[in-house]
Amino acid sequence: MDGTDVTMLMREIGIRARAAAAELAFAEPSRKEEALNAAAEAMLARSDEILEANGRDLAFGAEKGLTPAMMDRLKLDAARIDGIVEGLRAVAGQPDPVGQVIAEWDRPSGLHIRRVRTPLGVVGVIYESRPNVTADAGALCLKSGNAVILRGGSESFHSSGAIHAALQDGLRQAGLPVDAIQRVPTRDRAAVAEMLRMVEHIDVIVPRGGKGLVGLVQAEARVPVFAHLEGICHVYADGDADLEKARRVVLNAKTRRTGICGSAECLLIDRAFLAKHGPVLIEDLLKAGVEVRAEGELAEVPGTVPAQPEDFGREFLDMIIAAKVVGGVDEAIAHIRRYGSSHTESILTENDATAERFFRRLDSAILMRNASTQFADGGEFGMGAEIGIATGKMHARGPVGAEQLTSFKYLVTGDGTIRA
């Protein structure tokens, strides 16, 4: 497909999306719920087709030499399809955010003012190897009254296509425009460049992928962007941490799934914790098969690898973690401010004052206490799914669910009211 063809294709998709968004903006909540539940049923009915398509994508990924972490992100199986289905049903069952009254007040002038949620319009989602993003993004945009244009990576091309077909089945059954959820039907990378320039047709871009993709989108987009560049998540084991809680959380935060953005990439251990318990957290990680890149006294633990300066502030997305000893919560905070990506940080402590200091003095999108960073997920937050984790400070932060995909407008009522 040459450049002219891609430009025309994307323009046509944009025009159709804008028309669908105008209709979705006032669609009844019951019809959106019906579409999502029908899409969930279609996903189950098409599961064999989806798995067959995923098999082709996995073969393509293996030929391209994708890393184990990327192959894990790409892979679908029966359990992951069930997870997608449950996510669709969960989003369907949530309150509809469109039209919700955020605030309401009266003015001495006699005006009654309401601030109510309204859809953004058209959302563009650009993602790499995770085919489940097709379902998550489609569902959340539909729930929030937005049309969406999906541009999946070449690795997940067939899987995304099969999932997209199920979503459109749901739209048809509910009598909603199928153009509400469109997928870019080409692997041509020129389509990404076109999306980033489509200010007339797209209201916001959400990139889901690695540092290269997100950095490209942030650098070149003329359309506003919700994004996080990297998930450099920290776990800090405080001197007042409960040992057994700390052992459970650290192992889960690193090893449950290493290829997701909520995976812990750096372990900070209070010197007081080390004095009480020794290097047990490091030993647990080593026994689990994690490569621990350790600094200072932790590098003396047998089996560790000496850390290099570039290991701190690095997103490994693998069975690798950086580790160092710090002299208390303030030193941990200083380290996170220097090396973190404003994604997710967790403190392990039984000391309320220390936890509060950690929460107040850090400004990452998600801060946790005695919990695994792997909970940094819209589904785990009760959103049903997420379209991404936003780490910026404008509009949306943290998991971006249906509510975060809305803006607002003011409804002002008077009674022949005039301004003096």
From Swiss-Prot:
Metabolic or biological pathway, per its Swiss-Prot or TrEMBL entry: Amino-acid biosynthesis; L-proline biosynthesis; L-glutamate 5-semialdehyde from L-glutamate: step 2/2
A molecular function (GO) term: NADP binding
Subcellular location: Cytoplasm
Organism lineage string: Bacteria, Pseudomonadati, Pseudomonadota, Alphaproteobacteria, Rhodobacterales
Keywords associated with the record: Amino-acid biosynthesis, Cytoplasm, NADP, Oxidoreductase, Proline biosynthesis
Predominant localisation class: cytoplasm
Protein name: Gamma-glutamyl phosphate reductase
InterPro entries to which the protein is assigned, alphabetical: Ald_DH/histidinol_DH (IPR016161), Ald_DH_C (IPR016163), Ald_DH_N (IPR016162), Aldehyde_DH_dom (IPR015590), G-glutamylP_reductase_CS (IPR020593), Glu-5-SA_DH (IPR012134), GPR_dom (IPR000965)
Recorded catalytic activity of this chain's protein: L-glutamate 5-semialdehyde + phosphate + NADP(+) = L-glutamyl 5-phosphate + NADPH + H(+)
Recorded name of the encoding gene: proA
